[in-house]
Amino acid sequence: MMVKKLLIVKIGVVSDTHDDIENTKKAINIFNTMKVDYVLHAGDYIFPGMISLFKKLNKDTKFYGVRGNNDGELMGITRQFDEIENAQFLNEFGKLLISSKNIAIYHGTNSDLSESLKESQLFDILILGHTHIKRIEKMGKTLVLNPGPLNRNFFSKNTNDGPCVIIYDEKRELAEFININSTQNIK
């Protein structure tokens, strides 16, 4: 009898990059250092050219993203995704099966839809953006992840709180914020 072994994965989550090239490069460096298998972007790239930065992800990292409410140039976004190996643009809403996890990605523009997705319990992981509020919360069986905005202009310079990504480690069954300006949490 042959037993099929499930791949244990690490997933990087980012959202609301809002044209911040420097912070996006820092996030990509964290994803590469932590050897994530997937990067999921919950939208609001703004300028489609921002997507091309994700070409710097490790060769085997798969990149998926959805459209945010500030992402108006749909053709440009689609073209940028098409130019990246192992990348796919999922338009406004995406459903993925990664390892054994049913994952939904939605920017969060419609708060009623966001709440319905949370309450539906159809997904193991729900990735949102839009609100610029960081969140890692278990709601029933669904792990809700929102890394908050990556753009530095959404944070006070007088606070330790800053731009973050989320790393979900399936092996440890743990999701955690990684502040892009602090390398102490990178393992």
Please provide the spans of the model-predicted regions:
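N-terminal active-site segment of His-dependent metallophosphoesterases
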Residues: 1-53, 59-60, 72-78, 83-86, ...
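Binuclear metal-dependent phosphoesterase catalytic core
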Residues: 5-8, 95, 118-122, 140, ...
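Active-site neighborhood of phospho(di)ester-bond hydrolases with catalytic His/Asp-centered motifs
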Residues: 13-15, 39-44, 63-69, 105-107, ...
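Short acidic, glycine/proline-enriched helix-loop-strand junctions
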Residues: 53-66, 142
